[in-house]
Amino acid sequence: MEIKMFHILIGALLGLLFLATGTRAQFQFFEQMFGGGGHQQQQDHREQNVASDSSWYQRNYDNAHCSDYLCPGTLACVSVPHHCPCQHPDVEDKFELGDGSAICISKGGFKANEAARKVELARKGLL
C-alpha cells in the first residue's frame, strides 16, 4: 500500500512540475512577444531597417556624383547606359541587345552562355 501511495505522490509531483514548467515557458513567450514583464531596461541594438518607401534610394541617387550616366539600378557611373553592371552579378548574366541597351537575367543552369541562348530563342519567338 505504501509503495502505491509513493507512486501516486511521485506522479502528482511530476505532473505539477511539468505544469509549472509549461506555464512559465508560456509566460516567457508572451513576455518576449509583447515586451511585457517590466524588463524594458534592455535596449535593442540591432541596425535599423531601411525605409519601406523609396526615400533611402532617392537620397543616395540625389547625392551620387556622375558626369556621364548614372545607372539607376546600381548607382554606378558609366559612359553609356548599356555599360551598367547587373545588380547581382553572382546570380545574373548581362546580355547586351543590339540596339545599345542591355538586360540582366538570371544565370542559366549549368551550361556556359545558357542565358544568352534563351534570350535569342525568346527574340525569335521560340521560347
From Swiss-Prot:
Matches recorded under InterPro entries: LCL2
Keywords: Signal
Family according to the record: Belongs to the LCL2 family.
Extent of the signal sequence: 1-25
Keyword Signal: yes
Record organism: Paracoccidioides brasiliensis (strain Pb03)
Matches recorded under PANTHER family: LONG CHRONOLOGICAL LIFESPAN PROTEIN 2 (PTHR38425:SF1)
Claim: Signal is one of the keywords in the record: yes
Gene: LCL2
UniProt protein name: Long chronological lifespan protein 2
